[in-house]
């Protein structure tokens, strides 16, 4: 599975002009399941997303995770948005191939699993809508962006 995480001051996702998820300071994670991914891969990726130290401590060092945004235990928001295009094969030609992405039904199942697991482990989880045409707005903080990937 893949997650492109961005440290944000705020972010929201809309579907048909309706806000489906919004957060203040925290992480926006674009999430993609690849062919052959499993719940175990989703669990490993979620552990990375929740524990990845991308927020600055008092010394200005990236030493804090979304679960401890300010060093005093305050959790930040986590906005999860499905994005199958992260699995694109761009090695040949000028048109991406999405063959590496999980089929839609499997991608939805794993994304839903990822969201449920996140909600069980983190207090502030918002989402987009799987398979929908979404508009994502964010104020990137830094910018700080990382590509996280786990293998099946």
UniProtKB/Swiss-Prot annotation:
Note the NCBIfam families from the entry: D-aminoacyl-tRNA deacylase (TIGR00256)
Any one GO molecular function term: tRNA binding
Q: Name one GO biological process term.
A: D-amino acid catabolic process
Q: Which HAMAP family does its entry note?
A: Deacylase_Dtd (MF_00518)
The subunit structure is: Homodimer.
Organism lineage string:
Bacteria, Pseudomonadati, Pseudomonadota, Betaproteobacteria, Burkholderiales
Q: Protein name, please?
A: D-aminoacyl-tRNA deacylase
**Function statement:** An aminoacyl-tRNA editing enzyme that deacylates mischarged D-aminoacyl-tRNAs. Also deacylates mischarged glycyl-tRNA(Ala), protecting cells against glycine mischarging by AlaRS. Acts via tRNA-based rather than protein-based catalysis; rejects L-amino acids rather than detecting D-amino acids in the active site. By recycling D-aminoacyl-tRNA to D-amino acids and free tRNA molecules, this enzyme counteracts the toxicity associated with the formation of D-aminoacyl-tRNA entities in vivo and helps enforce protein L-homochirality.
Source organism: Paraburkholderia phytofirmans (strain DSM 17436 / LMG 22146 / PsJN) (Burkholderia phytofirmans)
Name the CDD domains on file.
Dtyr_deacylase (cd00563)
């Amino acid at each position: 599975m893949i997650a492109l995480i961005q440290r944000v001051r705020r972010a929201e996702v809309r579907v048909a002009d309706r806000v489906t998820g919004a957060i203040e300071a925290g992480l926006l994670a674009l999430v993609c399941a690849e062919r052959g991914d499993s719940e175990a891969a989703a669990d490993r990726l979620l552990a990375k997303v929740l524990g990845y130290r991308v927020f600055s401590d008092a010394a200005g060092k990236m030493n804090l995770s979304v679960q401890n945004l300010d060093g005093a235990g305050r959790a930040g928001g986590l906005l999860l948005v499905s994005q199958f295009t992260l699995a694109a094969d761009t090695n040949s030609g000028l048109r991406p191939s999405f063959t590496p992405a999980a089929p839609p039904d499997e991608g939805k199942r794993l994304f839903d699993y990822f969201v449920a697991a996140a909600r069980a482990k983190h207090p502030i989880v918002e989402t987009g809508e799987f398979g929908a045409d979404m508009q994502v707005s964010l104020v990137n903080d830094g910018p700080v962006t990382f590509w996280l990937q786990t293998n099946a």
